[in-house]
Amino acid sequence: MPENLLPAGIALLERGWLSSNNVVCTGRHGSAVIDTGYAVHADQTVGLVRHALADRPLDVIVNTHLHSDHCGGNAALQAAFPASRTLIPPGEADAARAWREGLLSHSGTGQLLPRFRVDGVLPVGESIALGEHEWQVYPAAGHDPHSVILFAPRHRVLVSADALWENGFGLVFPELVGHAAFDAVQATLSLIESLQPSVVIPGHGPAFADAASALARARSRLAAYRKDPKRHARHAARVMIRFKLLELGRWGRAEFEQWFDAARLLQHLHAEHFASEPWPGWRDALLEDLQGAGAIALSGDLIINRP
């Protein structure tokens, strides 16, 4: 969807799967960026945000949730724009302020996240002025129990984060650690439907206008996961491997096995869903799945990401 269909004062910096999209808001209420990508792209994020702001300062950094691909650029942006304020969802504010890594998701998935400063929390259930527009802040549990979405009602623009993509939604992380959350996904999809957005800016991928079709696809995927939670768990394990390969490009087999064996979320997935499969065999089977899908190449002791 061409960016010129977004109203003035909202710019989408479309990234990829390693880094979330960044949404730059400018206007009479100052300037803000919503979500900041992954740590290894932090310098690029700073450059992209500077370019989008032109000569303006960055006043506010907003995170829809604290997964590493959505807040990994926070520290770099804080260093580049020291007067900026960082607002996060309230559910993880205490853990982030004290930097209790065991309570933040990146430690369990073996991902990178530089520590950043927390200046305040988003007003869930209320509105916040960012750039030219007023944004309503809604709770959007499911993908993450503390996630929020932001909706600008004047132009019906929705920043959906990972609650809704054009083709699905993000992994349902609470389900992966034994907490029921498929009902929360369903409730969030119903909330999005009730807002009737004219434009959806997802956490990954281009903005899109056909929310109804995206919701239908998301509900179909949710039904499949409800029917077979093991399918969701296996998909999650593959996604974790692929995400790390997007970061590294290539991996020595020994280094991969060290990372895999230490990842707490993978340990939990195996114990919960795949305990009948020996750990080394399960690990190898996941690589074979990814190779069969054309996502990676195996060459001797190297594991290589394929674009």
Predicted regions and their residues:
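Active-site HxH/HxHxD metal-binding segment of metal-dependent hydrolases
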Residues: 40-43, 50-130
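C-terminal regulatory/interaction regions
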Residues: 233-307
